[in-house]
């Protein structure tokens, strides 16, 4: 009866047919116990040696990270790279927090510095503040960059007192005596209205509107004109002040010696025949007539001298011979002469 019953296989043979198929397809080699311990020890020694080299006591402490610079940041497109992979070893995962060096402030948080060409910020048109004393280069700044520290100072300078925008530029007085024009009281717009079209040099641009000058702008010229006896003009041009008082004084004719002598007409003529000489002075003609008549009214009164002369200057030169007076002296040497023509001849020798 026992032989007639069918013999069934054991339960363990078909408990896991999939596992049996996998084992038959990929046979697994069991490693030896001794070699596994040696490999594990070598891996641990390598990891410990690498960790001690990276975290040695001889390395100086790293400086604290500096704060990030003031600039625009934008997130990098794309998914961030994974910090770890499933294939990383056990030792690498354990030592990752100790071996990772702190990243720089510019790349912390997976942010990159944006180039200046990508950022475009629409701003209202700027007008140079004439009376606020701010340089145009500081007020505008480079395009595409955000300067927080510099814009704080320049913004306060451009806003003016009490945080208001600068008023429209007025024409300064043409004279230091005139009081400066103050802006009209009242609320100001945060931005100046756009200027209307106006004449420009070479191309379109904002037209500059000038207000009327101050009442005392021409006070200096009015006082000078009143002192000179000139009536002040009724109307004046906006940018054409009256002439300077110095120019008015120079325009008057000067009273004094002429720059060139006026040539006199020779009206005195000798009446002797075959002579016809003319002179500008009557005394010169009288002396000339004495040459024709032979008259010598000037006599030398020196004792023992009876010389006579027709001209007084000839008597004067003759009298110097008796006295020895020599008024004409050479400035290059010690010689002196009684006559000027003798000194002129002597000066030619020094030349």
Curated annotation (Swiss-Prot):
The terms describing its cellular component in GO are: chromatin; nucleus
GO: which molecular function terms?
DNA binding; DNA-binding transcription factor activity; DNA-binding transcription factor activity, RNA polymerase II-specific; RNA polymerase II cis-regulatory region sequence-specific DNA binding; sequence-specific double-stranded DNA binding; zinc ion binding
Write the lineage as a comma-separated list. Eukaryota, Metazoa, Chordata, Craniata, Vertebrata
Region described as Interaction with WWP1: 110-264
Q: Which PANTHER family match?
A: KRUEPPEL-LIKE FACTOR 2 (PTHR23235:SF109), KRUEPPEL-LIKE TRANSCRIPTION FACTOR (PTHR23235)
Residues annotated with Phosphothreonine modification: 171, 240
Q: Where are the zinc fingers (C2H2-type)?
A: 268-292, 298-322, 328-350
State the protein's name: Krueppel-like factor 2
Sites of Phosphoserine modification: 243
Q: Where in the cell is it found?
A: Nucleus
For this protein, the record's Pfam families field holds: zf-C2H2
The principal location of this protein is nucleus
Residue segments, region Disordered: 20-110, 156-209
Record's keyword terms, sorted: Activator, DNA-binding, Metal-binding, Nucleus, Phosphoprotein, Repeat, Transcription, Transcription regulation, Ubl conjugation, Zinc, Zinc-finger
For this chain, the Swiss-Prot or TrEMBL PTM comment says:
Ubiquitinated. Polyubiquitination involves WWP1 and leads to proteasomal degradation of this protein.
Q: Which organism is it from?
A: Rattus norvegicus
